[in-house]
Regions:
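Alpha-helical residues within the helix-turn-helix
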Residues: 42, 167, 185
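Non-catalytic signal-transmission and effector/linker regions of two-component phosphorelay proteins
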Residues: 1-5, 137, 210-213
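Intrinsically disordered, low-complexity protein-interaction/activation regions
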Residues: 47, 147, 151, 178, ...
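Basic, Lys/Arg-enriched C-terminal extension of HTH/homeodomain DNA-binding domains
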Residues: 184-213
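N-terminal regulatory/sensing modules of transcriptional regulators
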Residues: 1-132
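Hydrophobic "lid"/C-terminal helical patch
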Residues: 121, 156, 205
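Residue-level marker of regulatory loop/turn positions in helix-turn-helix DNA-binding domains and
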Residues: 60, 144-145, 194
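Helix-turn-helix DNA-binding segment
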Residues: 134-181
Length: 213
């Protein structure tokens, strides 16, 4: 949409600059490019944007989802678009709040042109509260995993041993072993030695973060 007021919330300076310039070329009025929650809320007060494009992971502090919820409280009709490498936001926080109604979730690795992003931003402006299916709910290896399994997946990726995970969670090592087997099954990892299984799980974790190793 030509001249639609947009704020860009992205903690990476290079992405913030290049993406902002590209969207300006598509006709959006880029009112602010900010890298944290505080500046995003201030930008909304100052510029009254029609839509916000946010990264999920903004580093230490509030997430993009937290920011979006605050933006929507201040303006119930603001369009919300998330653009991230994460295939499932629970990899940031397994207990994330629900996304604002009508939010559009885009994966950076699936967006091969800024035109596609611009189209989705326009949809968010025209129909900010439309019911939309979220991609991690309907597809992907993490879709059938519980929040607890997601947390154990993150613990494995952080290098914790089975005994350390069990101690942290106050359960038996056998219970953690069972969870690891379920996780590997959900991820489509074939049975193998424990060390190789962990390597495969860690690889899957980073792939789903959009940071393949």
């Amino acid at each position: 949409m030509k001249n639609a007021r947009l704020i860009l919330v992205e903690d990476d300076p290079f992405t913030r600059a290049t993406l902002g310039d590209a969207l300006a070329m598509h006709g959006f009025d880029i009112r602010a490019r900010v890298g944290n929650a505080f500046d995003a809320i201030e930008a909304q007060r100052t510029h009254d944007p029609q839509v916000a494009l946010l990264d999920l992971d903004l580093g230490i502090g509030a997430s993009g989802i937290d920011v979006a919820i605050s933006l929507r409280k201040n303006n119930p009709n603001i369009g919300i678009v998330f653009l991230t490498t994460y295939k499932d936001p629970r990899l940031i926080n397994s207990n994330i709040p629900n996304l604002p109604e009508g939010a559009i979730f885009l994966n950076k690795l699936e967006m091969n042109s800024t035109t596609k992003i611009a189209i989705q931003i326009s949809l968010a402006i025209v129909k900010p509260l439309a019911k939309r299916a979220l991609p991690w709910v309907r597809k992907g290896p993490l879709s059938s995993m519980s929040s607890t399994q997601i947390e154990i997946l993150k613990d494995i990726a952080a290098g914790l041993s089975t005994s350390e995970i069990a101690r942290t969670r106050g359960v038996s090592e056998q219970a953690i072993d069972k969870s690891i087997k379920r996780i590997s099954k959900n991820l489509g990892i074939p049975k193998s030695t424990d060390s190789n299984l962990r390597v495969q799980i860690v690889r899957a974790y980073f792939e789903n973060k959009g940071q393949g190793i």
